[in-house]
Amino acid sequence: MAATPESLQARKTRLLSVVRKIKSVALDPLADQVFGLLRSNPVCNKRVLTKYARVVKDPDPIATTQLLMGQKYPILAKEKYLHHFTPEERAANFAEEEDCRRPGWKRCTRKALNLWLDKEIEPNEETKQVIKVLYENSFDLVRDYLSHSWDRAIIRYGIVPKERQVVATRKVLVDVPKEYRQKAVVEIIQPGFNLNQPEVKIYVEKIMEKIGHKMVLGMSIVDQARVLLNSLDPKMRMLPVAVTLHDNLAQHSISYYGNNWMVHHLPGRVYDTPGDTNDLREACSLIMREVLKVKPEKRRDHLLHLRKGPQGLLEVLQETKENYPVKVIKSLLGLPCSKSHDYFGTQMIIEAAVEESRLVTSGGGVSWREYTGIERIHFRHDDVRGWYTHDGPLIKEIVFSRTERKTFTKLLVNIANYIHYDWAARPAKTAKEMRRLTMEEVMLSPWSFLGATRGIWQEFWARLDSSYFPTSEEIRNYLQMGDGEIKIRCVLETEVPGDTSVYYRVTDEGALVEVGGSSRIPKIESLPKRSSKTLDGTWNSNDMTFIPILHPTVCLPRTIEFHYSRPDLLSDIQCFNFSNYNQHCPYLLPANERASFCNTARMMLYGASTQVRRWPKVYLAYLYCFAGFHETPTVSKLHRTRFLTYDEIDLYAQRGVFKHNPENDTWLIFNKEWVGLNDPFQFPGLLVSSALLGYRLENVTHAGKRKREDDLMDLKDGMKELESKMDGSSVYV
């Protein structure tokens, strides 16, 4: 908004008033002290004065530089370095008075710079450290470029498909989202400035681990903050980049390819690999499965109880490449996610999603949500880029960059499945079978999906393979497949929107809808099967939502600890409620001995139910972990078995993964002492014989199961009655 004439006149009046006051000070006896104070304290009103008194943006910097270099004193030098020059050199090359715009500096000639270089004065260590910090990124770029054997590189000639995309032109110290960079730097310079912001603390800790020498003496706080802030800025730029170029090479992109050539297999080239990113993404799929079972309002609290080593889940997600489960967990935690999402190898970006939708169910019982209305979706698939529009299951238009026929056909398969093409008419009973049938149809006759004929399809690819692109006044640089209702065009180059991050909310159906926006990420119907059904041993939690999926060596101690801390444990044992929060523990045992082992644990709890105060609570919690298994045992009196492949597990707590040390009355779990527990313990063998072996007793007086007493019988008749019934049957005695 332009300033009004009145405001400009007011500024001018204030400026002239200040100038008159400064001029009047020159007549004061203490004028030197006043001017010295103004020069040494360039803040507050003087800063405001400077803002309004000078032009910040030079309209023609080249002309200004040429004008300055033509003057007698075009350069400024600090006064403290003048002692390196002789009096004759100072008189010939330096102005007598200091520069009126910068206190402590003097104007000098261009020859003074050459004299300084000829003296070859060795900078002190403090100056060297400052130079190292200021030019560290440039040093790294040069070091990286010269570390490779360019003379041994393989160059391939041909068309280099390119796309305009936002890429990082500089490697950052720590990957910090833009909205947190300034806050993190302020927190480092002024600890405690950002209160109640755990996200900032996460990045501050990472920066402090790597900051090393970046905070040096000899630099002002403002300069150090600027250097630190620059080291966190990847300098994202929109550039035409080769489609197949690795992200880490964007800073040297001009050295890796041209219009018709590209470097391959450069010796010494080391790429940043995702490390255990795949493991983290698999872990997130397992975490997502469990947390979605919880009420929506409690999901975030449960996730915050999960840790991986010393890191919380918030920190772990910062290092994890996004897929659907990662996006879901990030959204539940209130973190931003990328609009781009993977659909079986194709990156999709829905810029503006349609709002109207309906739930569709096929004849085989497969249900999905179908969005009606024209919707444009951008895509990336291998080396092909472009976009397509669709209306529900009908494709309307496809625009794609130059690629091979095989790659384009695979892309069509994913597009067809993404928009649920012809799913309503398919007889499949699962989403996986639907995708398989769609793939077979599109791979067999892709032209049918595009509304064309086989002849048009063959002619199009023959012309494309011959590198023929028609050029006219109206149409340039694209090749169209036929003249049907569905527009299919191949272009030389295309653009995909930059990868932006937004906030999503998770719907009841599992889809992600942008908060305050119009983009959408649909639920992925099927996720890759995990090789393991549990997390690795570095994950930990005290929340029963995630304890069942922890590594067995972590799961068992955490389950015992959970029941030990649960106030209802003793009342559950006395009321014979043996199935609370322990359904996962029996599956840590061998399948053929699982039922018998758990039945023994249940019988021992029956025996202890009348004297729960006599037995250590940690031991009762241990027995309770295995007392809720529902299957009828085929082997009797099994109190010891294998705990997966780790060690034995003994209900008597005499050996194996959980045992009692009688010498000092301590408890050991995986040979580690349970700190704080020193309860006396006696041999529990008599508990096994305290109830009917091979039978399961249930208290039904409080459960409301028994409505009448005409089918009630005594114990002897009940046992005889069960002999003629199938396993798992029950009678009331």
UniProtKB/Swiss-Prot annotation:
Superkingdom of this protein's organism: Viruses
Assembly mode: RNA polymerase is composed of three subunits: PA, PB1 and PB2.
Keywords: Cap snatching, mRNA capping, mRNA processing
A GO BP annotation: 7-methylguanosine mRNA capping
Function: subunit of the RNA-dependent RNA polymerase which is responsible for replication and transcription of virus RNA segments. The transcription of viral mRNAs occurs by a unique mechanism called cap-snatching. 5' methylated caps of cellular mRNAs are cleaved after 10-13 nucleotides by PA. In turn, these short capped RNAs are used as primers by PB1 for transcription of viral mRNAs. During virus replication, PB1 initiates RNA synthesis and copy vRNA into complementary RNA (cRNA) which in turn serves as a template for the production of more vRNAs.
Gene behind the chain: PB2
Organism: Quaranfil virus (isolate QrfV/Tick/Afghanistan/EG_T_377/1968) (QRFV)
Protein name: Polymerase basic protein 2
